[in-house]
Amino acid sequence: MNRDYLVIVPTYNEITSIGILLPQLLELNLDILVVDDGSPDGTADACRALGLESGRIVVVERKKKLGLGSAYKAGFKYGEDRGYKFLIEMDADGSHQVSDLLTLMSTMETSGSDLIIGSRWISGGAVQNWARRREWLSRSANVYARLLLGGKVKDMTAGFRIYRTAKLIQIDLASVKSEGYCFQIEMTKRMSQIDGVILEVPITFVERKYGVSKMSKKIVFEAIYRVTAWGLSAKFRRKRP
């Protein structure tokens, strides 16, 4: 079963965390694609070394920082071209638990869904070691996106996901322009637009122990701008005679 899955892990300066995560994934006999944005700390080299030992890790090293959305689109293309049935998104920083991944995979196998989202904000979901301000920001962002875009997904910004490739290929990835965490919102929206079956599964999100968060004002602004634009565009379309 695990040969049907590809884990896509974008990285930028995650040399400590990635050295913990990858061995855990290898214990599950999973294939892994690391998309590194030119990390100066040697993340790509560390991943390549693990790949030589296991034969299960491929590293795509890009020359500069191109963003989360671009990294995942590159990973999707790689997985689609090689016939993987399911494509997993997972953070490199250890915030997504491998124990939860097993639950997501099992649910994908049994539910017939097209997108499984590891959700912090449904019953049973949780976050650990977050400041109240950050939790408020994440919850508010998801409420805002849901109000403007519709749908029932509670955690549209979640980055712990499994896509069914047969459905994912129906999305024109070249037209997906979001770069930061807004990419997750846009992909949720696109999956809904093609009538994809989306299911949220509760997870526990644990704040990183090592490295620095990639969240920035630019990423937050992109999400506000794009979600507002999508929401207003949909509203005006509905009002047309």
Residue ranges and their predicted role:
Residues 11, 35-37, 62:
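Conserved sequence signature across two-component system core domains
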Residues 12-27:
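Short, well-formed alpha-helical segments that are part of the catalytic scaffolds
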Residues 3-5, 26-34, 42, 56-57:
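Short loop->beta transition adjacent to catalytic acidic/histidine clusters or analogous donor-positioning motifs
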Residues 16-20, 41-50:
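Acidic helix N-cap motif at the loop->helix transition within catalytic regions
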Residues 1-4, 150-151, 174-241:
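Hydrophobic helical membrane-anchoring modules
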